[in-house]
């Protein structure tokens, strides 16, 4: 016995629905989902995309005074001096340098939140804008974020 095409197609969908209606609804739903997904925040591409918070930079300033100012001034980490060494270098390199070598009298003693706060302070001193999400100690992600100053 041969089943007419119309009956075969209707048996795939729920009873009472036409096959084209089901396909159209699915296609429209998929399109709307893609459209909504594209409306979300875009991933940051550099340190100019607000990868730290102002509160984090403020905390970093206090940590800099406590742990770093004995040997360093913030000018060493800002402007042309910073750019000459760190321009286009991934943020992960700065994280690693601070985490593994500072402070000089106790290298490696700073925790992740302290290191990222110090980085936020350095970014702030270089005019890199703050954002709404704190900088996290995610080295894989930081490895994709080049350090750039405004005007670069």
Question: Could you say what each language-model-derived stretch is?
Answer:
Residues 77-96, 103-116, 134, 149-151:
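Electron-transfer interface patches adjacent to heme c in soluble/periplasmic c-type cytochromes
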Residues 36-38:
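C-terminal motif of bacterial Sec signal peptides marking the signal peptidase cleavage site
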Residues 40-62, 106:
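Electrostatic cytochrome c docking/interface patches
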Residues 18-28:
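Bacterial N-terminal signal peptides that target proteins for export
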């Amino acid at each position: 016995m041969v089943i007419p095409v119309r009956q075969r197609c209707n048996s795939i969908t729920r009873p009472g629905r036409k096959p084209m209606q089901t396909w159209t609804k699915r296609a429209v739903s998929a399109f709307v989902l893609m459209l909504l997904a594209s409306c979300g925040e875009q991933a940051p591409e550099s340190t100019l995309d607000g990868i730290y918070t102002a509160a984090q930079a403020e905390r970093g300033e206090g940590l800099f005074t406590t742990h770093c100012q004995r040997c360093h001034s913030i000018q060493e980490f800002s402007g042309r001096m910073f750019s000459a060494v760190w321009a286009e270098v991934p943020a992960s390199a700065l994280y690693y340098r601070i985490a593994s070598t500072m402070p000089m009298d106790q290298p490696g003693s700073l925790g992740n939140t302290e290191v990222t706060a110090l980085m936020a302070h350095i970014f702030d001193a270089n005019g890199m804008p703050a954002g709404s999400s704190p900088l996290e100690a995610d080295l894989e992600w930081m490895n994709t974020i080049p350090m750039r100053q405004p005007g670069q």
